[in-house]
């Protein structure tokens, strides 16, 4: 007879099913239950990756919607279609409300449970990076004092993660590289500091290249993928500084086996 599964194991399995079915809101719910079942115990690498993938997909869909609606709003404004603009603004604020709720949910979980229970260097960096990411997503659409506050919280999260990463993780570690990638995107997009963005991305890339021969087979693929994204952004940003282009900036993407 098969051994009885704990509620925690059952919820992990349900989260994987929800991921396969691309039902990410439910995946979030299952992983929040896993976190609750864990009490003060740390999540496993698999569990934290599933949680990250779930939230990244839920927030990613709304971020994409917000960008599309904002673009349409700008076009309608330039055409002077005030009636349309008013309708679009209402719709945009609905999406922004959803974005805020999602970010508030994961940030609360990070502050109350995930960060306090993190014991290893890589899990601390993972969660602090995540904290920076979700404050950055708030900074993308907030304005005025709220945007300033979100940007400051992003910087605090990323800097805390960077301090631990530099001290405890090798330059080739996928989580350290993913942090550098997203931190540099923050400098470029939110703080409008292309020089700082390029310096951070270049330093992370160069340090990783210097130690590439120490990479194990396990993380080689993950690390080299993020290094490629760092290089893509550097190429894009240096050409942007010359001709003000607007191609797509790359961020660390969620993966089930190794989450950046």
From Swiss-Prot:
Pfam families: 14-3-3. The lineage of its organism: Eukaryota, Viridiplantae, Streptophyta, Embryophyta, Tracheophyta. Belongs to the 14-3-3 family. It comes from the Eukaryota. This is 14-3-3-like protein.
